[in-house]
C-alpha cells in the first residue's frame, strides 16, 4: 500500500515509544506537535512546575541528591522530568510504551513485571536478537499508542515512555498520571535540551535503582560504554556531510540537535542540520540541496503506516528534481537504519557502526 511519506513519517516520529501514533488530528497538527516537542520547552515547563510524588508507602526522608537509597527504609528517590518520586519497593505492573523501552527492561531481567506493551511504530523484530523471544511473548495492549483509558485498564503502577507520551498529542499529561497514582519514567534523551549518550546510561542507572537491579544495570551500562569508547578510539573525524531523512514529499523531516546528531558525530560524520534546535524538524528540499550531503540516512520502519517504504523513500529522493545534483543522490550513498536505532536506547551504537563503515569508504 502506498503511503503518504510526509504524514506517515511525522506521525511515526511522534508515536514511537515514542508514543503518539493515532493521537494527532491531522497533518498540520502533526507538524505543530513536532515543533512543540522541542526539548528546551518541555524541560522548562517541567522544571517550573516540579512536583513530588511517592510510590507505595512514602518515606519521610528529604532527599538531597537526585538519586539516593536510604538504608533504613530501602527507599529509592528518583528525580526525572521535573518530578521527584520515592519508591519504597520495586514496581510490579509495568507498561512500556514501545519495544525499545521494553527492550531495556528485558535486558535488566524485568520481563515478568511487564503486564503489557504498546507497540508505537515498532516491532519486537526491530530489537536485538538476544531479546526478541522474550519481547515476542509480551502482551500487546494496543498497536500504536494507547488512550489513557486503555492504559488504565492494565492497572499499571509504572509506565516507561518518551516525552511525547505526556504532551498534547500523547497519552495524557503528567497530572493525569499523578491523579491515578501511576508512577512513570520519561526517557531522558527525549527531553534533554541537548541529548547525549549519557542520557541513555542515566535511564538504565535509574531503572536499576527503581527495580533493585543495580548489578544488571551496571553490567549493561558498561557494555554500552565499551562500544562508545571503541568508536571514539577508532573513528577518525572526517569532512563527510550527512543528512537524516525520515520522510517528506513537500519538505524533509530531518534530525537537528538530538541523539541522532550525537550518533552522526560519533561515526565520524557531520550532520548538515546540526544547527536546528529540535531533534526533528522540517526543512525545504532546496535547503537540503544547498547543504549537499554526501550520505543520506534513511529511517526504516518495519510496521505501522510506513511499512515497506524504505525503497519508496529512496526512490522519491532520487526522483526529486530539487535534489538531482546532491552528491548522496548521484552516488547512491544511502545508509538505512531502524528508527529505534536513532532514538536513545540500546541500539544507538549499531547505527553509529553502520554509518561509520560508509563514512570510512567515502573518506578513503
Regions found by a protein language model. Name each.
Residues 95-154, 158, 163-164:
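A short, structured surface patch at a secondary-structure boundary
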Residues 123-125, 163-172, 182-206, 243-261:
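Extracytoplasmic ligand-binding site segments that recognize negatively charged/polar headgroups
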Residues 195-212, 216-218, 297-364:
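Structured C-terminal subdomain patch of bacterial secreted/periplasmic proteins
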Residues 79-82, 138-149, 277-285:
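Short helix-initiation/N-cap motifs at beta->coil->alpha
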Residues 2-10, 14, 23-103, 209-244, ...:
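Bacterial Sec-exported substrate-binding components of ABC uptake systems
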Residues 121-125, 253-281:
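Alpha-helical, coiled-coil/dimerization segments enriched in small aliphatic residues
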Residues 163-166, 189, 276, 299-303:
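Short secondary-structure boundary segments
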Amino acid at each position: 500500500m502506498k503511503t503518504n511519506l510526509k504524514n506517515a513519517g511525522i506521525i511515526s516520529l511522534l508515536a514511537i515509544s515514542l508514543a503518539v501514533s493515532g493521537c494527532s488530528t491531522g497533518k498540520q497538527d502533526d507538524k505543530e506537535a513536532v515543533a512543540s516537542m522541542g526539548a528546551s520547552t518541555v524541560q522548562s515547563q517541567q522544571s517550573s512546575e516540579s512536583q513530588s510524588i511517592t510510590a507505595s508507602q512514602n518515606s519521610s526522608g528529604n532527599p538531597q541528591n537526585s538519586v539516593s537509597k536510604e538504608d533504613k527504609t530501602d527507599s529509592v528517590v528518583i528525580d526525572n522530568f521535573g518530578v521527584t518520586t520515592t519508591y519504597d519497593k520495586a514496581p510490579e505492573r509495568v507498561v512500556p510504551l514501545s519495544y525499545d523501552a521494553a527492550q531495556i527492561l528485558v535486558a535488566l531481567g524485568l520481563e515478568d513485571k511487564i503486564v503489557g506493551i504498546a507497540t508505537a511504530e515498532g516491532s519486537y523484530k526491530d530489537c536485538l536478537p538476544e531479546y526478541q523471544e522474550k519481547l515476542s511473548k509480551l502482551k500487546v495492549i494496543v498497536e500504536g499508542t494507547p488512550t489513557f483509558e486503555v492504559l488504565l485498564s492494565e492497572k499499571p503502577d509504572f509506565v516507561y515512555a518518551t516525552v511525547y507520551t505526556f504532551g498534547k498529542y500523547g497519552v495524557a499529561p503528567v497530572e493525569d498520571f499523578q491523579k491515578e497514582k501511576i508512577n512513570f519514567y520519561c526517557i531522558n534523551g527525549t527531553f534533554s535540551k541537548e541529548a547525549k549518550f549519557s542520557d541513555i546510561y542515566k535511564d538504565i542507572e535509574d531503572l536499576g535503582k527503581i527495580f533493585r537491579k543495580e548489578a544488571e544495570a551496571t553490567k549493561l551500562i558498561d557494555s554500552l560504554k565499551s562500544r562508545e569508547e571503541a568508536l571514539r578510539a577508532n573513528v577518525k573525524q572526517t569532512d563527510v556531510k550527512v543528512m537524516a531523512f525520515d520522510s517528506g514529499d513537500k519538505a524533509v523531516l530531518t534530525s537537528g540537535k538530538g541523539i541522532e546528531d550525537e550518533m552522526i558525530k560519533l561515526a565520524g560524520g557531520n550532520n548538515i542540520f546540526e544547527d536546528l534546535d529540535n531533534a526533528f524538524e522540517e526543512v525545504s528540499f532546496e535547503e537540503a540541496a544547498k547543504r549537499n550531503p554526501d550520505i543520506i540516512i534513511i529511517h526504516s520502519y518495519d510496521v505501522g503506516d510506513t511499512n515497506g517504504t524504505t525503497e519508496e523513500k529512496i526512490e522519491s529522493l532520487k526522483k526529486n528534481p530539487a535534489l538531482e545534483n546532491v552528491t548522496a543522490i548521484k552516488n547512491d550513498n544511502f545508509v538505512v537504519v531502524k528508527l529505534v536505532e536513532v532514538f536513545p536506547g540500546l541500539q544507538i551504537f549499531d547505527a553509529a557502526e553502520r554509518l561509520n563503515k560508509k563514512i570510512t569508504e567515502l573518506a578513503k
